[in-house]
A protein has these predicted regions:
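Residues within mature, well-folded domains
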Residues: 1-86
Length: 86
């Protein structure tokens, strides 16, 4: 799901749907941006596998705009995931 494909959910909604991240990189208020797989972002929520260090999912934000939820594949590439409906 991307912000362009439908109305962008807010941070509280995404938090409720995917839960608290294991780690966070950057901040939506951070002026510096990063680029991953062609997406510019300044905050990344990181979700690691339970009991491990392997990253299984990330949520990307650019400022307060939701960019999407992505499954991190074994080769390091991203696969878009739909936002869970809880």
């Amino acid at each position: 799901m991307s912000a362009a494909s439908q109305r962008s959910p807010d941070r509280a909604t995404v938090w409720r749907m995917v839960g608290a991240p294991t780690d966070q990189v950057g901040s939506v208020n951070e002026p510096r941006t990063h680029e991953t797989h062609g997406l510019k972002w300044n905050e990344q929520w990181v979700y690691r596998v339970e009991g491990g260090q392997e990253i299984e999912r990330v949520v990307l934000w650019h400022r307060y705009d939701f960019l999407g939820v992505f499954r991190v594949l074994h080769d390091g590439s991203f696969e878009p995931e739909p936002l869970p409906t809880k």
